[in-house]
Amino acid sequence: MKGRTIFKGKAKGEVLMTSEDISFYGGCDPETGVIVEKGHELEGKSVSGKILVFPTGKGSTVGSYVLYALSKAGKAPLAIINESTDPVVAVGCIISEIPAVDQVDIEKLKTGQKVEIDAADGVISIAN
C-alpha cells in the first residue's frame, strides 16, 4: 500500500484499527496511552507501541500536545496511518517524531495484523 508522507520514519508492529475518529485531548490518557473516550470503539485499549490506524483526528488543538506527552511518557503509538490526517494529528506526529502516512484505504488493515511502515516513502507492507 502507498500513501502520503506526513512525518518520515520506519516502524514495524501490530495494527490497532478503528473506523472512528480519535480525539487525543480528552479521549486518550497521556500518561497511559489508553483510549478513555466513553463509547469509543477503542475505549479501554492502549495505543502504546501499536501502529494506530484511524480515519482522522477530531477535537481540540491540544491533541498535538497529548501526542507529544505520550511520546515523552514512552506510551505513544509506533506510527499513525490515516485516511486523511488533520492538522492536529500532523503537528503531534511531527513534534513527537511519530512516523505517519495518510491517503490510505484503512479498510484493508485490521487490528492484530503485523505491518511495516516506511513513512519517508509512504509505503505500508503487511507482514505474512
Task: Label the model's feature ranges.
Residues 3-11, 16-125:
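Feature captures the catalytic cores and cofactor-binding loops of soluble hydro-lyases/lyases
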